[in-house]
């Protein structure tokens, strides 16, 4: 039978991608259905109990800037907050939080259940209803049919998932959850390129069996950071430390002596695992010269005795896992409460997607998360938000939207996936972005909140706070520009106390702040420049904008140049052997990829800026230089 009520958008899957997709669609006013196999696992943290990190924290801030959920949830659930790379420049600073799994899940579920236009229904999905190359609904395992104008698939590792522990394996979506086999078979019938990937998780340890007294502690930052632009530290629950131990030669001997029992090294697992989160057996073999690896013992929650040993993801047999754990300092008597495992699953080539994350071959069908070949909660959530908002726009007969590479890390993520594809689980890093100085955590709202408002994602409260912040920044910068001090001033000694080189000419507040030895708090502590802003976010923006103004202007010039490249079209039938000066490697790659524009060509691995310059000169000489409108 068909469900009595029609929907505009159906989201299949209630993980990090699915919850953001459902929230985005519902916030935009579309009647949205979230189908999940288990309502109790909405927002489940399937692997590590943490949000954020290098590149990942940037994505969380971008989700928040557009009204998304993840940052608000982790502010309510985080039990240790830190700023990574705090001693480096603002472009690469990143927020990370350990999270209480239960509190995080509760925060997500509460938000979903209180979101207007959103219906949650518990049933696994076995089939899609496709008519004339257009998806029009979904069918659950009990045969119940739902109709919708768009469907978002956020099925994580569940598509034909297979769990491996040693040489044994069984079907599963993750530990304790069934796989989605009928839906995987249905998707393989569609004209889509499918392959397999693998990821893994470490064993969980009973905290009561660890000797923490011999381990180094790691505490969070004080004052505590927050993730959401609307958040504050008073929302955080009680805080907990992490602990650090290390593998050793005994650990590595155990692993090397049992590689024949590893499903990866025995050839049982065919899927490729994440390069930047390798298993402990991979670490030992790939970095054979290292006799130790750092392992972080991370609490899973305020009321849980489970510890997540970050750094020993493994699919070795349980008896080997037991030996590995007990070989490390402080863990000599440790007990495993959940074994580590690897999981293989289907993913679909993201080059078959539009930048809106709509499938090129099945109209109205959107993919987000691990189904696109990514790894990580944050990458999934960001894609989910984008897919959800574009599904809502399609349902409303509006054009889709996708951020550019210079606008957001989400733009980098989507462009990398849709242009280059991936053969291994894709993880976000700041190094993937060309315009890191523009794509900072601290300015995610300045980049995206106005766009989110135009799209219908940002509510009145966030919009009002955003405009107050903008006004504060501009007024404060103008105030500093209007305050001058000259070498004859009686206040000169106060100012010179901050400077490495005494003031020799008249200067205003911004010029003083631009000096590397002067920070905003010091400057506004001087009577002449007091009082400073009490809004810490606005004050941070004033300092960064002033200090990095020249660098930001240069990067903006680069962006404008790159935008010209994006609009410079390449002939579809061009044989790059004709272009004098290109290396054989570059010619082969360009002929293989057939990029549609100079911008796309520039992002192909191995295509250098010099090659792009040669290509532009050749196009101009041949009279083939064309730009899109």
Swiss-Prot record:
InterPro entries: FAD/NAD-bd_sf (IPR036188), GIDA_C_N (IPR049312), MnmG (IPR004416), MnmG-rel (IPR002218), MnmG-rel_CS (IPR020595), MnmG_C (IPR026904), MnmG_C_subdom (IPR047001), MnmG_C_subdom_sf (IPR044920). GO terms for cellular component: cytosol. One of its GO terms (biological process) is tRNA methylation. FAD binds at residues 13-18, 125, 180, 370. It comes from the Bacteria. Pfam families: GIDA, GIDA_C_1st, SAM_GIDA_C. Its cofactor is FAD. NAD(+) binds at residues 273-287. PROSITE patterns: GIDA_1, GIDA_2. GO terms for molecular function: flavin adenine dinucleotide binding. It is found in: Cytoplasm. Disulfide bonds: none annotated. Keywords: Cytoplasm, FAD, Flavoprotein, NAD, tRNA processing. Homodimer. Heterotetramer of two MnmE and two MnmG subunits. NAD-binding protein involved in the addition of a carboxymethylaminomethyl (cmnm) group at the wobble position (U34) of certain tRNAs, forming tRNA-cmnm(5)s(2)U34. Belongs to the MnmG family. This is tRNA uridine 5-carboxymethylaminomethyl modification enzyme MnmG. It comes from Pectobacterium carotovorum subsp. carotovorum (strain PC1). The gene is mnmG.
């Amino acid at each position: 039978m068909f469900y009595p009520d029609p929907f505009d958008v159906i989201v299949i899957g209630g993980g990090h991608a699915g919850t953001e997709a459902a929230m985005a669609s519902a916030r935009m006013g579309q009647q949205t259905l979230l189908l999940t196999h288990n309502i109790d696992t909405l927002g489940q943290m399937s692997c590590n109990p943490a949000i954020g990190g290098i590149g990942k924290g940037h994505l969380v801030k971008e989700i928040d800037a557009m009204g998304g959920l993840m940052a608000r949830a982790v502010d309510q659930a985080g039990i240790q907050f830190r700023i990574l790379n705090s001693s480096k420049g603002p472009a690469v600073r990143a927020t990370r939080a350990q999270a209480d799994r239960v509190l995080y899940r509760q925060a997500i579920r509460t938000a979903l259940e209180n979101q207007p236009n959103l219906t949650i229904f518990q049933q696994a999905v076995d089939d899609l209803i496709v008519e004339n190359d257009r998806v029009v609904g979904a069918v659950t395992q009990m045969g119940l049919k739902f109709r919708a104008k768009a469907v978002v698939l956020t099925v994580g590792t569940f598509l034909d998932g297979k769990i491996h522990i040693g040489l044994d394996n069984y079907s599963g979506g993750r530990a304790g959850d069934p796989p989605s086999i009928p839906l995987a078979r249905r998707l393989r019938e569609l004209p889509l390129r499918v392959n397999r990937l693998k990821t893994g998780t470490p064993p969980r340890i009973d905290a009561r069996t660890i000797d923490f007294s011999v381990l180094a502690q790691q505490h969070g930052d004080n004052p505590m950071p927050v993730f959401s632009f609307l958040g504050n530290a008073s929302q955080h629950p009680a805080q907990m430390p992490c602990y650090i131990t290390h593998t050793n030669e005994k650990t590595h001997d155990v692993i090397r002596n049992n590689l024949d029992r590893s499903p990866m090294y025995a050839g049982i697992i065919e899927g490729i695992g994440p390069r930047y989160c390798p298993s402990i057996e991979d670490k030992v073999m790939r970095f054979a010269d290292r006799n130790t690896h750092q392992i972080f013992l991370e609490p899973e929650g305020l009321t849980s005795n489970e510890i997540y040993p970050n750094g020993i993801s493994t699919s070795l047999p349980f008896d080997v896992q037991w030996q590995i754990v007990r070989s490390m300092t402080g863990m000599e008597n440790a007990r495993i409460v959940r074994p580590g495992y690897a999981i293989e699953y289907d993913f679909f080539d993201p080059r078959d997607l539009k930048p809106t994350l709509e499938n090129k071959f099945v109209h109205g069908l959107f993919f987000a998360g691990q189904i696109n070949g990514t790894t990580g909660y944050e990458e999934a959530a960001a894609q989910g938000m984008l897919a959800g908002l574009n599904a809502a726009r399609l349902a409303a007969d509006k054009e889709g939207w996708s951020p550019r590479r210079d606008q957001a890390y989400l733009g980098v993520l989507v462009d990398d996936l849709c242009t280059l594809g991936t053969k291994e689980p894709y993880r976000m890093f700041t190094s993937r972005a060309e315009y890191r100085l523009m794509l900072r955590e601290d300015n995610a709202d300045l980049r995206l909140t106005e766009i989110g408002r135009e799209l219908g994602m940002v509510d009145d409260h966030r919009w009002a706070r955003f405009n107050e912040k903008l006004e504060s920044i501009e007024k404060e910068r103008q105030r500093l520009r209007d305050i001058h001090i000259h070498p004859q001033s009686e206040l000169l000694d106060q100012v010179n106390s901050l400077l490495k080189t005494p003031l020799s000419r008249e200067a205003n507040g911004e010029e003083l702040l631009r000096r590397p030895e002067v920070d905003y708090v010091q400057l506004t502590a001087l009577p002449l420049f007091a009082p400073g802003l009490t809004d810490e976010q606005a004050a941070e923006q004033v300092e960064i904008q002033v200090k990095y103004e020249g660098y930001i202007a240069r990067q903006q010039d680069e962006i404008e140049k790159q935008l010209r490249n994006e609009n410079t079209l390449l002939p579809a039938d061009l044989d790059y052997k004709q272009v004098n000066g290109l290396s054989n490697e570059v010619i082969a790659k360009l002929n293989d990829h057939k990029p549609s524009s100079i911008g796309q060509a520039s992002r192909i691995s191995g295509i250098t800026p010099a090659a792009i310059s040669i290509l532009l000169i050749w196009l101009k000489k041949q009279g083939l230089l064309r730009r899109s409108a």
